[in-house]
Regions:
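Residue in the alpha/beta-hydrolase core beta-strand immediately N-terminal to the catalytic nucleophile
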Residues: 70, 93-96
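Flexible "cap/lid" loop of the alpha/beta hydrolase fold
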Residues: 86, 95-114
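Conserved catalytic-core motifs of eukaryotic protein kinase domains, centered on the activation segment
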Residues: 18-19, 42-47, 106-109
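Conserved HGGG/HGGXW glycine-rich cap/lid loop of the alpha/beta-hydrolase fold
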Residues: 2-42
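Active-site acidic short loop of glycosyltransferases
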Residues: 1-2, 27, 65-67, 90
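Active-site signature of alpha/beta-hydrolase-fold catalytic machinery across serine-
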Residues: 20, 83-87
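Active-site loop/oxyanion-hole signature of alpha/beta-hydrolase fold enzymes
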Residues: 33-72
Length: 114
């Protein structure tokens, strides 16, 4: 059985846009994904992204058939995936974050002031 990837896309870039990436991975991995983050009224966009994290978790639970996933996310999707893994670690074998929007070090102080 191939490892299972759950993919979460970047802000405003639906998962289908990543089809060429999925095509490159499909020989070695099974791939599931959340189609569109932030457009489903059951998962409103709120401070702290709580409901968007719920959307990631629900997507995994509904599609994984009980298998642990490699959580793969791009930008916003990577942060939501990390938050989902923190909340429900039993769903994940690992997390891979592509281009996470983290600002660390001295520069982060200026963003906290903004």
């Amino acid at each position: 059985m191939k490892p299972l990837i759950h993919f979460a896309h970047a802000n405003g870039v639906p998962s289908k846009v990543y089809q060429k990436l999925f095509d490159q991975l499909k020989d070695q991995y099974d791939i599931i994904y959340v189609a569109e983050i932030g457009t489903d009224k059951r998962y409103p966009i709120t401070h702290g992204w709580t409901y968007l994290v719920d959307q990631i978790i629900d997507s995994i639970v509904q599609q994984s058939q009980g298998r642990k996933v490699i959580g793969l996310g791009h930008s916003l999707g990577s942060v939501l995936t990390l938050m989902a893994a923190y909340r429900r670690p039993e769903l994940f074998s690992q997390v891979i974050m592509l281009d996470p929007p983290f600002i660390i070090g001295k520069a982060s102080f200026a963003f906290h002031l903004a």
